[in-house]
Each structure stands twice: as structure tokens, then as C-alpha cells.
Design a protein with these regions (language model features):
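Flexible, polar/low-complexity N-terminal or interdomain linker segments that lie immediately upstream
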Residues: 1-35, 89, 111-179, 268, ...
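Cysteine-dependent PTP/DSP-like catalytic domain, specifically the C-terminal lobe
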Residues: 251-276
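C-terminal soluble interaction/assembly domains
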Residues: 226-227, 245, 265
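A mid-sequence, solvent-exposed acidic-amphipathic segment
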Residues: 156, 162-205, 213
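Terminal peptide-recognition signature
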Residues: 13, 41, 99, 117, ...
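Thiolate-centered catalytic microenvironments shared by cysteine-dependent enzyme domains
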Residues: 58-154, 174-175, 182, 234-251, ...
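Helix-loop module immediately N-terminal to the HCX5R catalytic loop
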Residues: 51-80, 193-225
Length: 276
């Protein structure tokens, strides 16, 4: 297999369709996959790679649950996994984050996702591809995930930047989703969509633009960066962008603000509770 980058261009992927150790995964909603997908792609349902419990919407599942999900799509350790979705790649990014957390070695995201492929006139198929089931063993490392306790331990660390990637309205409490609005103390804010060029098939902006977006808010490579949103859906995309840019010390908060904002013992800046 060639040495694909973290974000792969659709035209770069095209000549490798059918390569033996290439596994293309469409993690869009099932109906989108049925209507058309990259030739050879198998479908993976997003709910299979997240775990709801208590007030948490999308934590990382236990090892045995992840093992079943990845085995069902025939994943093997030697596969280079190429992933995309139809919603500008947050689901694809969450799966890539999960693969990195379990130390799967080779993975990429299609730059622009499904739009980056089909809107540029590349071939599309509608055949439902049924994979041969594998036995894929999962062991989480904890190196990519920031737990609530981990974040609490870093709140006063000057070498750590906590990055909130939610909508402006969530950050400012105009939109309240959890019991307690607000933000993790000290967090800086950058809406995850700022890095995506809607006029270029939802591909990423050039690297210099991306770096400037982050530098303006103090997100620099020398720091450890912890990214979060409500469910580590949008923040997973920002995680991938940071890794693409060469940031080596990045973690994602899998349980997200759905855990932090529904807990009773977490510190919150600009806390807001709607009593109506």
C-alpha cells in the first residue's frame, strides 16, 4: 500500500480502488450508502462505535463491543482504512480517532468526504458490499482519550489548551443541551466548521489557513491540546485536523460536554441553568 496521508484526496484514492489491503468504510447513514458510495466501500453504522450510558451520549464502547463492530466489517490489522461520511466527516473522524486509540496502524479520511468524491465526478456504485467477517481484537490504550478526571487534573496546567469546538450558541449558552450550560474552565473556542471550505466540496482549507485559525486562539504545537464538543463528534474532526498539521500531543474527550455538563461535581465557567 502507498503511504497515504491522514486526509487523502479523492483523486489520490481512485487508482487504488480494489487494492488487496485497502478497506474503504462509508460511515454515513444507511440510506445515503444505499443511494451510492465509493466503489468497494462497506458500510458501518455510526452507533456501533459509540456507547450511551447514564447522561453520556457517545462515549467510547468497551473493547468487546468495538471488537464485534470492527470484525463484522472484516477489518484486519494489515488494512489501510479509508473512511468518509456525507456530513463533512465528523463520523469518519470519530472512527479514525477510535482506530488510533486502539493502535490500528494505517488509516485516512477522504478530504471532503462523500461530497469530495461524488461532486467531482468520480465513479459511484450502488451495490451493497457484504464483507467477510474477521476476528479483530481491540485493546484501548487511553492515549487518545481524555476522561473527565484527566481533564480535571489539567485545568491549571499552563502547557495544556482545552479547545471547545461546539457552535457559538452552545459556547455562549444561547443553546442549552445539558443540565448545566457553560464551558470547561479556561477553554478557548473554535467552531469545528471554520476549518472546512464549503465552496470547495467541503475540503479542508490550506494548511497555512488552518494553522492561523488555531494560532489566533493560542492552539500551538508546543502545547497539549484537549478537544471537546457535546459528544466528540465535531471535536473528532478538529482532532484529525490538528494531527494532520503535525500536533503531536492531542486528546479527544469521548464523553464530551454531555458528561461534563450533566455531572454535578464538575467545575464550569459561565455556568447557566435554565429553571423554566
Amino acid at each position: 500500500m502507498p503511504d497515504f496521508t491522514r486526509f487523502i484526496e479523492a483523486e489520490t484514492l481512485k487508482p487504488h480502488l480494489g487494492d488487496a489491503n485497502l478497506k474503504i468504510i462509508d460511515i454515513s447513514i444507511p440510506q445515503v450508502y444505499k443511494e451510492g458510495h465509493i466503489p468497494g466501500a462497506v458500510h458501518l453504522s455510526y452507533p456501533k462505535i459509540v456507547h450511551a450510558h447514564d447522561d453520556v451520549d457517545c462515549d467510547i464502547p468497551p473493547d468487546d463491543v468495538l471488537s464485534i463492530a470492527l470484525s463484522e466489517i472484516g477489518l484486519r490489522p494489515e488494512h489501510h482504512v479509508v473512511i468518509y461520511d456525507s456530513q463533512h466527516n465528523p463520523m469518519a473522524s470519530r472512527l479514525c480517532w477510535t482506530l488510533e486509540e486502539i493502535e490500528h496502524k494505517h488509516f485516512s479520511i477522504v478530504n471532503g468526504g462523500w461530497h469530495g468524491w461524488k461532486d467531482t465526478g468520480l465513479p459511484v456504485e450502488t451495490e451493497i458490499n457484504i464483507p467477510d467477517v474477521s476476528t479483530y481484537k481491540v485493546c484501548q490504550t487511553g492515549r487518545c482519550n481524555a476522561t473527565t478526571e484527566y481533564i480535571k487534573s489539567k485545568l491549571d496546567d499552563p502547557n495544556v489548551v482545552i479547545l471547545d469546538t461546539r457552535l457559538d450558541e452552545e459556547y455562549t449558552n444561547e443553546l442549552l443541551i445539558t443540565d448545566r450550560g457553560g464551558m470547561i474552565p479556561g477553554a478557548v473556542h473554535l467552531d469545528w466548521m471554520v476549518n472546512i471550505n464549503e465552496n470547495d466540496h467541503y475540503r479542508l482549507y490550506p494548511d497555512d489557513v488552518l494553522m492561523e485559525n488555531f494560532a489566533k486562539i493560542g492552539v500551538v504545537p508546543e502545547k497539549e491540546i484537549i478537544v471537546y464538543c457535546q459528544t466528540h463528534f465535531r471535536s473528532a474532526h478538529t482532532y484529525q485536523v490538528l494531527k494532520h498539521l503535525g500536533f503531536n500531543h492531542v486528546r479527544g474527550y469521548a464523553a464530551g460536554y454531555s458528561e461534563w455538563g450533566n455531572a454535578t461535581d464538575t467545575p464550569i465557567e459561565n455556568e447557566f441553568i435554565d429553571d423554566d
